[in-house]
Amino acid sequence: MEKDLKFTTSHEWVRDNGDGTVTVGISDHAQGLLGDVVFVDLPEVDDEVTTGEGFSLVESVKAASDIYSPVTGVIVEINEELEDSPELVNEEPYESGWIARIKLSDSSELESLIPSDTYLESLDEE
């Protein structure tokens, strides 16, 4: 796992793209709990999202799980590959399984996210 990723307590990950946008997906831990992903309800480009509010839905053979926005901003890109290949969320959660790119309203929000090493330690305690 990349050291530059940050996480939320609800198991979303965030990659700072360095241009005022972030890429968002769900963690390897989350996809493992869900099991085989069969559908991803993607947000729309230009949708406004707010920290902590649901903006996507991932359905698996076991359950449907809301995906919560880790930051406030505007959706600038969605991963359209997931429409035909939702299994990418399972196979490559940190690479081709990303869900959306968000233009940040306030980059300081990134400071409140959980660093990757702290996130991994919290999983070991579960």
From Swiss-Prot:
The keyword Amino-acid biosynthesis does not apply. InterPro entries: 2-oxoA_DH_lipoyl-BS (IPR003016), Biotin_lipoyl (IPR000089), GCV_H (IPR002930), GCV_H/Fam206 (IPR033753), GCV_H_sub (IPR017453), Single_hybrid_motif (IPR011053). Its cofactor is (R)-lipoate. Residues 21-103 form the Lipoyl-binding domain. One of its GO terms (biological process) is glycine decarboxylation via glycine cleavage system. The modification N6-lipoyllysine is found at K62. Binds 1 lipoyl cofactor covalently. Keywords: Lipoyl. Disulfide bonds: none annotated. PANTHER family: GLYCINE CLEAVAGE SYSTEM H PROTEIN, GLYCINE CLEAVAGE SYSTEM H PROTEIN-RELATED. Belongs to the GcvH family. This is Glycine cleavage system H protein. The gene is gcvH.
